[in-house]
Amino acid sequence: MARRFGVVAAHGKPEAVELADRIQRWLAAHQCQIANEEALPVVWPELDAIIAIGGDGLIMRVAHHYPDVPILGINVGRVGFLALAEREGWERALHDLVHDRYHVQEGPTLAVQLERGRSVLVDAWAINDVVVRAGYQLIEVELYIDGQFVNTYPGDGMIVATPQGSTAYCMAAGGPVLTAGVHGFAVTPICPHSPIRIALVVPEQATIEQVYVSDREARLIIDGEPVASLERGDLVRVRRGKQAFRLVVLPGTNFYEAFRSKFNFQIRPEAQPSRRTRNADTPSGAR
């Protein structure tokens, strides 16, 4: 049976659109069935994978629209940490894809509800993170884990991040990077007005609740998209989501090498390992 792949490109990047056209011609020449962006809403449940040509934003949008379908990201953005193949190596990546030389890494998602009194104002899910974010003034957020009060955090807000989201806003705010295989979520205060700046890593089974206890402007942000303004007493409840974020992982993918190169994390650029290291095909904690 012919393999079936969807192809989506970032429309704002001419180089991505041009590469998408080349990829579709290549797939057709290798006896694969192709679904372009217009056909995806109908055929997506039948696809072997979706090839997303762009950056991390495009990959997350595709995952939101077509949950549980494996995604191969080809990076034509800047950092592109979720895009595990680079533009220069697209043909080799497709060879591995069509010949089943890959595995699928499943990452957890976040189910989020915003409750105001007895009303549920937001019922959504996130791939990377759920953020309570201040406007221009300090706010206060109460944090509860599994019903137990942790603390009240004065500052700019709070981030709850998945492993794949931990290398995004969470890391920038000083939170931990969670590698794949860590079955937990990072809870990171944003610029807390305190000398104690401690992020938490909680189990995937935990229920994370944030109660907004300020009268100042703040928003609920899901995967970078503002979805609601917050009022005093609002409750943001976060649990593990039902959906899975599925990435196509190609042979030779190495999370730590990608982490060094894409985030310029080389303290000494000339540093080399003193012993042989093995290639790890599983990228831990992709963003």
UniProtKB/Swiss-Prot annotation:
PANTHER family (alphabetical): NAD KINASE
GO cellular component, one term: cytoplasm
Official protein name in the record: NAD kinase
Function: Involved in the regulation of the intracellular balance of NAD and NADP, and is a key enzyme in the biosynthesis of NADP. Catalyzes specifically the phosphorylation on 2'-hydroxyl of the adenosine moiety of NAD to yield NADP.
Annotated keywords: ATP-binding, Cytoplasm, Kinase, NAD, NADP, Nucleotide-binding, Transferase
Keyword ATP-binding: yes
UniProt keyword Metal-binding, yes or no: no
Enzyme class: transferase
Catalytic reaction(s) noted: NAD(+) + ATP = ADP + NADP(+) + H(+)
Pfam families in the cross-refs: NAD_kinase, NAD_kinase_C
Subcellular location: Cytoplasm
InterPro entries: ATP-NAD_kinase_N, ATP-NAD_kinase_PpnK-typ_C, NAD/diacylglycerol_kinase_sf, NADK
MF GO annotations: ATP binding; metal ion binding; NAD binding; NAD+ kinase activity
Cofactor(s) required, per the database record: a divalent metal cation
Organism annotation: Thermomicrobium roseum (strain ATCC 27502 / DSM 5159 / P-2)
Membership in a protein family: Belongs to the NAD kinase family.
EC code(s) of this entry: 2.7.1.23
Name of the coding gene: nadK
Example GO BP: NADP biosynthetic process
Amino acids binding NAD(+): 56-57, 61, 128-129, 156
Major localization class: cytoplasm
Entry annotation: catalytic residues: 56
